[in-house]
């Protein structure tokens, strides 16, 4: 049973290994991407159609999810979505870079 839940921002080919590794570690992979047909969306435990560049939309989606389940982390790999990750982490009280630092 997958207890801990992680949001992975992005579902392209570069994020697929991160999604797979998270799942191999027993994590429940919630994946945000604007493309519902992206490779990572097909293997996500919970795919969510949200643009990686839509910081406010990603924060709203993450906050909504956090009312239904505990979110334990948020990451991205191989993308320029560090500001989105920072904003989501900050909004949910998770460890991460400050938005100002990610934006710099």
Where are these regions (language model features)?
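ATP-binding N-terminal substructure of ATP-dependent carboxylate-amine bond-forming enzymes
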Residues: 1-103
């Amino acid at each position: 049973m997958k207890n801990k839940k992680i949001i992975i921002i992005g579902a392209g080919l570069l994020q697929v290994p991160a999604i797979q590794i998270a799942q191999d570690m027993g994590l429940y992979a919630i994946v945000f991407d604007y493309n519902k047909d992206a490779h990572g969306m097909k293997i996500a435990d919970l795919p969510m159609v949200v643009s990686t560049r839509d910081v406010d939309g990603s924060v709203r989606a993450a906050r909504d999810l956090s009312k239904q389940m505990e979110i334990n982390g948020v990451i991205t790999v191989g993308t320029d979505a560090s500001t989105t990750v920072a904003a989501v982490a900050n909004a949910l009280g998770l460890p991460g870079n400050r938005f100002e630092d990610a934006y710099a």
